Amino acid sequence: NGELDAMVFAACYVCGELLIQRMDGIRDGYKETFPEFSDDLVFRFENSGGEGQIVNTKKIVTDFVTGHPNMNRIVVGTNNDEGGLGALSAIEGMGMKENFFIVSHGGDTPFQEKIHAGKGDVWIGSVAYMPERYGEFMIPWLLDILNGKDVPREMSPEHFILTTDNINQYYPKK
């Protein structure tokens, strides 16, 4: 029904404003459909520790559930797919798949492998950056610069959400 008890974000907040905006985009997207969702239910955890994203995120999610036993409908947002792996490991280890959704950033191999393995019921999406396609938009932009044309100061490919519905279009199962 779309109702949440909490959003738990595990990210490298010390990495800067752009990353903070990416994480807040998860919240903002949800609030487009459910505008009454309180920002007080968004819990942000720094995830730049030395143990790595997978281990850190697993601990963050496990500790959050332990400390908030009455929160049963939770979205975990991570700034990369390694964090998504940690969240999935925690959720599966606690036997709470029906209580969680994971949204990550990257659309990289860890996400692709888990979706192809049928884990899309929990890990529902990852923002795809597709760095392997950067040349498709960078080369024309660079040629315009070399030819003296006015170009935007910054360029970025369009990002989108990879899900079980579209993953084979971009990354077919091997």
Predicted regions and their residues:
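Structured segments of extracytoplasmic/periplasmic soluble domains
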Residues: 1, 29-36, 60-67, 90-94, ...
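Hydrophobic alpha-helical segments within soluble ligand-binding/sensing domains
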Residues: 1-5, 21-22, 54-58, 84, ...
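Extracytoplasmic substrate-binding proteins
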Residues: 1-37
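Conserved acidic residues
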Residues: 5, 72-75, 124-125
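Short beta-strand elements in bilobed, periplasmic/extracellular small-molecule ligand-binding domains
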Residues: 6-9, 31-54, 158
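Hinge/cleft segment of the Venus flytrap/periplasmic-binding protein
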Residues: 10, 18, 129-174
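Hydrophobic alpha-helical
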Residues: 26, 41-114
